[in-house]
Curated annotation (Swiss-Prot):
Induction: Following heat-shock treatment. Changing V24A: Reduces the nuclear migrating activity. 'Hikeshi' is a traditional Japanese compound word used for a firefighter, smokejumper, or troubleshooter. It comes from the Eukaryota. Forms an asymmetric homodimer; required for binding and nuclear import of HSP70 proteins. Interacts with ATP-bound HSP70 proteins. Interacts with NUP62 and NUP153 (via F-X-F-G repeats). Interacts with HSPA8. It comes from Homo sapiens. Keywords: Cytoplasm, Disease variant, Leukodystrophy, Nucleus, Protein transport, Transport. One of its GO terms (cellular component) is nucleoplasm. Acts as a specific nuclear import carrier for HSP70 proteins following heat-shock stress: acts by mediating the nucleoporin-dependent translocation of ATP-bound HSP70 proteins into the nucleus. HSP70 proteins import is required to protect cells from heat shock damages. Does not translocate ADP-bound HSP70 proteins into the nucleus. Residues 124-134 are annotated as: Flexible linker region involved in nuclear import of HSP70 proteins. The lineage of its organism: Eukaryota, Metazoa, Chordata, Craniata, Vertebrata. Changing Y55A: Reduces the nuclear migrating activity. GO terms for molecular function: Hsp70 protein binding; nuclear import signal receptor activity. This is Protein Hikeshi.
Length: 197
């Protein structure tokens, strides 16, 4: 039903079922993992109104599991990428794996998936720094940066009559900055990653 992928490692598709509605994947040598992908295999969908809460567990200094909610997978969003590199310290959160008798070893973390009602999942709050930045947030940042630059540069605009001749300084016409701004916005709207080519 589920798969788990870590860069540079084989895909895991044999989750250990620890309860009727709970599954775990072992992540050996978890200290070297930055991101993990959790996905549905496409063979069995969730029942109507259900989804999977995805948790990350690592052993604390006493070897006790610390569980943190990463996010969710659903029939409508069958895969998700989570950043776990910053989660290996900190406090755990409420989780459904507490009473489970799951075999653990010191350098092994786990990804847990709990099948739950979509309504109850919507009321849970994943740990903040588990989400991977998306193109949308990058696009928003770029748009804000463009606006800020244009507003800053425009605040220095003067007409030719107001200019004081200064042979050592170069001046850029405001319409050139506006043309660049509009061109950059157009290209960003067409392809948010155009600047990489």
């Amino acid at each position: 039903m589920f798969g788990c992928l870590v860069a540079g490692r084989l895909v895991q598709t044999a989750a250990q079922q620890v309860a009727e509605d709970k599954f775990v994947f072992d992540l050996p040598d978890y200290e070297s993992i930055n991101h993990v992908v959790v996905f549905m295999l496409g063979t069995i969908p969730f029942p109507e109104g259900m989804g999977g809460s995805v948790y990350f567990s690592y052993p604390d200094s006493n070897g006790m599991p610390v569980w943190q909610l990463l996010g969710f997978v659903t029939n409508g969003k069958p895969s998700a990428i989570f950043k776990i590199s910053g989660l290996k310290s900190g406090e755990g959160s409420q989780h459904p794996f507490g009473a489970m008798n799951i075999v653990r070893t010191p350098s092994v973390a786990q990804i847990g998936i709990s099948v739950e009602l979509l309504d109850s999942m919507a009321q849970q709050t994943p740990v903040g720094n588990a989400a991977v930045s998306s193109v949308d947030s990058f696009t928003q940042f770029t748009q804000k940066m463009l606006d800020n630059f244009y507003n800053f540069a425009s605040s220095f605009a003067v007409s030719q009559a107001q200019m004081t001749p200064s042979p050592s300084e170069m001046f850029i016409p405001a319409n050139v900055v506006l043309k660049w701004y509009e061109n950059f916005q157009r290209r960003l709207a067409q392809n948010p990653l155009f600047w990489k080519t």
